[in-house]
């Protein structure tokens, strides 16, 4: 889980409550935020500062700043309850968006008169980087720019340019102008994120004078560098998913309101941002009490929702709940039930001992998976962990597989277009991992042991007609890798865990013909291995030969 370090004095100031170490250690975990450490550190001026390190659940990106954390704690403690109304002032600031294939979505907002100091500046920088990871997938999905608005002139333009079309001074090179192409070749951030630039097309944000604000997702220009004396902040979010871009903007501007900032709208191609209109959901009182095992009346439930920064209206057995725009984690009614449980108080729930004594033990399949992981690490592979949710493009299209929609399970209301299908295979995600890491040194040897979900029409025990199966997959990439290398690693794994296996020639669309083998155990196919087809390698934008295997674990 991501962690944040916050200054205790700053947290007290924003929470509007005196915070003893005991209060912090007792109450924050009850609202779902773990306290890792309370410690002292010396700042750059030689003064001792009392600090607190918190672990933040990935589903609460609004807690990734001291501002959001303090806002949540005020509600949890009953200091400030109910939904907060955010005023957004109109302006004539405009952004023109020209065609942009790489990162087509963009949102802007201006927050004026922020009470800026060293604490606020550090908090904003940390929030920016944490959101890059938590929502932005290390800037692949979205990138954030925060600028000193007083140093630029509206209107602004967001477009794509070629690598040598313009020069500007990037952050970190205070007096050296560079072209975008030079930045990805020489600048530390440019080298790190060069893989996000495609076909020599560089997204760029310019002001009315042609000055560069940002080269997303790489680096901002020095011109708009934010300092402790900045007070008017222009925020830009660019990315590949519209919903994620808009939600991230909402989180940032609502955090800045905690610093007495005033939100001002920006017109982006005719649409005003930010949109802080509360969302709403309808949930029945009966379903809440059934899930929580309680007998709360509507008033008690509404009070719990108010403590979580929401509001609700009771009508005919149902609650119409208003949810603030910065809460992107409320996806289903079960999320509301969790909020009610947290703010009702987990300490109020009665614990009951089961009437039957049981003895726990490790699941045999999990035990086998752990042993397989140890063996793969011994063979020089690095273990990775991907999400079970993926998409058709990664799982099938890039692998040259023709798959009927009946052969996989699709999420009805996905939170992201990248996570709309339950994976049926692990190997495609390993190729995606190699793409993300192709800027790192070779050779690269990775593996994963995990769940895949397949349709099971013969399932009579559940209504889902699907089941989880464990698989292990591995991949190797470097200029000289070949069939023999992956055969050697696969055989080592099979000899240890699969008795009576044999190989058979296999024609698989993702592999080179004649360089792929099927793995059989007692005449039943349990896996395959071989050299990945060059077309598939190019589909994943890889640059070197790749070999791989995948085996179903019984």
Swiss-Prot record:
EC number per UniProt: 6.1.1.20
Subcellular location(s) of the protein: Cytoplasm
Cofactor field: Mg(2+)
Ranges where the B5 domain occurs: 276-351
Chief location bin: cytoplasm
One of the GO BP terms on file: phenylalanyl-tRNA aminoacylation
Residue stretches in coiled coil: none
GO cellular component, one term: phenylalanine-tRNA ligase complex
InterPro entries: aa-tRNA-synth_II/BPL/LPL (IPR045864), B3/B4_tRNA-bd (IPR005146), DNA-bd_dom_put_sf (IPR009061), Phe-tRNA-ligase_IIc_bsu (IPR045060), Phe-tRNA-synth_IIc_bsu_arc_euk (IPR004531), Phe-tRNA_synthase-like_B3/B4 (IPR020825), Phe_tRNA_ligase_beta2_arc (IPR022918), PheRS_beta_core (IPR041616)
Keywords associated with the record: Aminoacyl-tRNA synthetase, ATP-binding, Cytoplasm, Ligase, Magnesium, Metal-binding, Nucleotide-binding, Protein biosynthesis
Family indicated by similarity: Belongs to the phenylalanyl-tRNA synthetase beta subunit family. Type 2 subfamily.
Name of the protein this chain belongs to: Phenylalanine--tRNA ligase beta subunit
Taxonomic path: Archaea, Methanobacteriati, Methanobacteriota, Methanomada group, Methanococci
Gene: pheT
């Amino acid at each position: 889980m991501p962690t944040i370090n916050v200054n205790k004095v700053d947290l007290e100031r924003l929470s509007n409550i005196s915070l003893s170490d005991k209060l912090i250690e007792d109450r924050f975990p009850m609202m779902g935020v773990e306290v890792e450490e309370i410690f002292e550190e010396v700042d750059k001026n030689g003064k001792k500062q009392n600090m607190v390190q918190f672990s933040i659940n990935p589903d609460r990106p609004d807690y990734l700043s001291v501002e959001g954390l303090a806002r949540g704690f005020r509600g949890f403690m009953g200091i400030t309850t109910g939904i907060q109304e955010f005023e957004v002032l109109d302006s004539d600031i405009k952004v023109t968006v020209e065609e942009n294939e790489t990162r087509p979505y963009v949102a802007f907002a201006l927050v004026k008169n922020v009470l800026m100091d060293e604490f606020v500046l550090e908090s904003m920088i940390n929030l920016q980087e944490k959101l890059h990871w938590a929502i932005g997938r290390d800037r692949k999905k979205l990138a954030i720019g925060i600028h000193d608005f007083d140093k630029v002139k509206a209107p602004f333009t967001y477009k794509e340019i070629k690598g040598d079309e313009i020069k500007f001074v990037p952050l970190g090179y205070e007096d050296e102008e560079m072209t975008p192409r030079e930045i990805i070749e020489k600048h530390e951030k440019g080298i790190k994120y060069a893989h996000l630039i495609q076909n020599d097309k560089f997204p760029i944000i310019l002001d009315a004078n042609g000055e560069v604000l940002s080269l997303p997702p790489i680096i901002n220009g020095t011109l708009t560098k934010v300092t402790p004396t900045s007070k008017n902040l222009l925020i830009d979010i660019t990315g590949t998913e519209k919903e994620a871009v808009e939600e991230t903007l909402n989180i940032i501007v609502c955090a800045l309101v905690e610093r007495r900032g005033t939100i001002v709208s920006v017109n982006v191609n005719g649409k005003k941002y930010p949109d802080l209109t509360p969302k709403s959901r309808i949930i029945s009182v009966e379903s809440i009490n059934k899930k929580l095992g309680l007998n709360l009346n509507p008033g008690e439930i509404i009070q719990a929702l108010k403590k979580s920064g929401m509001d609700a209206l009771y009508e005919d057995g149902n609650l119409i709940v208003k949810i603030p725009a910065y809460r992107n984690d409320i996806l289903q009614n079960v999320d509301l039930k969790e909020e009610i449980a947290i703010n009702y108080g987990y300490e109020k729930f009665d614990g009951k001992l089961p009437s039957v004594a049981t003895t726990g033990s490790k699941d045999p399949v999990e035990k086998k998976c752990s042993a397989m992981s140890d063996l793969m690490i011994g063979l020089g592979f690095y273990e990775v962990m991907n999400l079970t949710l993926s998409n058709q493009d990664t799982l099938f299209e890039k692998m040259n597989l023709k798959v009927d929609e009946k052969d996989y399970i699709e999420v009805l209301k996905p939170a992201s277009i990248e996570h709309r299908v339950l994976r049926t295979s692990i190997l495609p995600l390993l190729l995606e991992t190699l793409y993300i890491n192709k800027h790192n040194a070779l050779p690269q040897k990775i593996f994963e042991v995990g769940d895949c979900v397949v349709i099971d029409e013969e399932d009579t025990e559940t209504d889902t007609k699907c089941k989880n199966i464990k698989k292990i997959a591995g991949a190797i990439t470097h200029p000289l890798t070949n069939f023999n290398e992956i055969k050697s690693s696969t055989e080592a794994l099979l000899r240890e865990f699969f008795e009576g296996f044999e190989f058979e020639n296999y024609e698989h669309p993702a592999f080179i013909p004649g360089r792929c083998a099927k793995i059989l155990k007692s005449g039943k196919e349990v896996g395959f291995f071989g050299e990945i087809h060059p077309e598939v390698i190019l589909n994943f934008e890889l640059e070197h030969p790749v070999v791989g295997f995948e085996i179903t674990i019984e």
